[in-house]
Amino acid sequence: MLDIKLLDIIACPLCKGKLSYKKNSNELICKFDHLAYPVIDGIPALLKVKARTISSDEE
């Protein structure tokens, strides 16, 4: 589980936009780039190679 306080200081590594946390999938979502970054053992994996592309339905 992610410490929600991190959302105030982290940003998407590609566009520097705000990320939102999706608890049920344990991912950080960038709505601008349509990417989902996994949170592994409470640590956000903010690497493009770890991200998956998401559809607008998943956002």
From Swiss-Prot:
Coiled coil: none
InterPro entries for the chain: Trm112-like
Recorded superkingdom: Bacteria
SUPFAM superfamilies: Trm112p-like
GO annotations of cellular component type: cytosol
UniProt family annotation: Belongs to the UPF0434 family.
Protein name from the UniProt record: UPF0434 protein Ping_0902
Lineage, highest ranks first: Bacteria, Pseudomonadati, Pseudomonadota, Gammaproteobacteria, Alteromonadales
